[in-house]
From Swiss-Prot:
EC number, as in UniProt: 4.1.1.105
Native organism: Clostridium sporogenes (strain ATCC 15579)
Record keyword tRNA-binding present: no
Protein name: Tryptophan decarboxylase
CC annotations in GO: cytoplasm
GO molecular function: L-tryptophan decarboxylase activity; pyridoxal phosphate binding
Coiled-coil portions: none
Reaction(s) catalysed by this chain's protein: L-tryptophan + H(+) = tryptamine + CO2
Alphabetical GO biological process terms: L-tryptophan metabolic process
């Protein structure tokens, strides 16, 4: 590990205190030229002892503005201290979590996974138009049918056609011959440049796509492409202690990755992350942002520096081995659940190394779905699946209660058939 290590509470406090001392403090400076200030102290008062002992809350109240991308542009006169935390965080994620080589990466903390995915699509659309002189109608987004709806938001906002690739009902995998025929047809109608959204843990199934499947077929047809991996759910679990992982930066075909701190990492909402290889993010530079010292290449404008600090603190609290232990605990709970489902001969889908179990609809009645807040694939009578997500709060006692109800329902259900 190059950047990721476990910190004590005192070490974290000292590091963040030092960062805040290098960050603009509106109380002790004559700052009158920017439209910003600290949080309103009639509501966000900082004189409680618990605030003084919380590096995150002190950062939140000091209110650093992390506008821009600080791995790309090193301007840091106003908020340089917490900028440094975000820079370190991006390199930690790219190299120590996502298995990048000893190189630099670009990235920033977004408002969520949706923004990170749209940032990627924006970067690659502009890359193809600027670097390859592509016509707008020659560019397409391509992704699996199980992909998060943010891909469709990006398609709409960027006015790029999107191609949806069907998946097998049971394996949730893209079939090579299906993808081949779809790409061939797209080429025949004039598509030459492809933005791939490849999944590392889909929202409904936790399924993982093979980026190399896309790469091999595009290479076969001599087509240009950029692969973005949506790891909003799977990014903090699937690559951990997983030698089979092909969806990270160890794969030369992967250009960028989305992560989301507010899911597996249990960070506050607003802690998505976009990480990319160098020499890509400059394609979204907004030259008109002339009054900003930083070069503005991000979809977000102003954003809270406390979100970057929150993500860094969670990772630093555990360290790589503490995090591995936590992830393996959730995997073991998931394996226990799957064993019970196997014993009951209930059909389900689960991706290796993931903590989502998706059960076929026929084995779940309305009462069970409502009692455990099981999420359907669609909220209408055509629904085929319900999902279970084994998060930190989902202990074996809860899973055992679910198993009891499933066993009771399916025993009665089978008798009636």
């Amino acid at each position: 590990m190059k950047f990721w290590r476990k910190y004590t509470q005192q070490e974290m406090d000292e590091k963040i205190t030092e960062s805040l001392e290098k960050t603009l403090n509106y109380d002790n400076t004559k700052t009158i030229g920017i439209p910003g200030t600290k949080l309103d102290d009639t509501v966000f008062y900082d004189d409680h002892s618990f605030v003084k002992h919380s590096p995150y809350l002190r950062t939140f109240i000091q209110n650093p503005n992390h506008i821009g991308c600080h791995t790309y542009d090193k301007a840091d006169i106003l908020f340089g201290g917490t900028f440094d935390i975000e820079r370190e965080l991006i390199q930690l994620l790219a190299i120590d979590v996502l298995n990048g080589n000893d190189e630099e990466f670009d990235g920033y903390v977004t408002q969520g996974g949706t923004e990170a995915n749209i940032q990627a699509m924006w970067v690659y659309r502009n890359y193809f138009k600027k670097e390859r002189k592509a016509k707008h109608e020659e560019i397409a987004i391509i992704t699996s049918a199980d992909t998060h709806y943010s891909a469709y938001k990006g398609s709409d906002l960027l006015n790029i056609d999107i191609i949806k690739v069907p998946v097998d009902f049971y394996s949730r995998k893209i079939q090579e011959n299906t993808l081949d025929s779809i790409v061939k047809e797209a080429k025949e109608i004039g598509k030459k440049y492809f933005i791939v959204i490849s999944n590392m843990g889909t929202t409904m199934f936790g399924s993982v796509d093979d980026p190399d499947l896309y790469a091999n077929i595009f290479d076969k047809y001599n087509l240009e492409y950029k692969i973005h991996v949506d790891g909003a759910f799977g990014g903090f679990i699937y690559p951990i202690d997983n030698k089979e992982c092909k969806t990270d930066f160890s794969n030369k075909n992967v250009s960028s990755i989305t992560l989301d701190g507010h899911k597996m990492l249990q960070a506050p909402y607003g802690t998505g992350i976009f990480v990319s290889r160098k020499n890509l993010i400059h394609n979204t530079l907004t030259k008109e942002a002339t009054y900003i010292e930083n070069l503005d290449v991000t979809l977000s404008g102003s954003r809270s520096g406390s979100n970057a600090v929150a993500i860094w603190m969670v990772l630093a609290s555990y360290g790589p081995y503490g995090w591995m232990e936590k992830i393996n605990k959730l995997r073991n709970r998931t394996k226990w659940l799957c064993k019970q489902l196997n014993d009951m001969r209930i059909k389900y889908y689960k991706e290796d190394s993931m903590n989502i179990v998706t059960i076929e609809e026929q084995y779940v009645n309305k009462e069970i779905a409502e009692k455990y807040f099981l999420v359907p694939e669609v909220h209408n009578p055509t629904n085929n699946w319900y999902k279970i997500v084994v998060m930190e709060h989902v202990e074996l006692d809860i899973l055992n209660s679910l198993v009891y109800d499933l066993r009771k329902f399916n025993k009665e259900h089978l008798k009636a058939m």
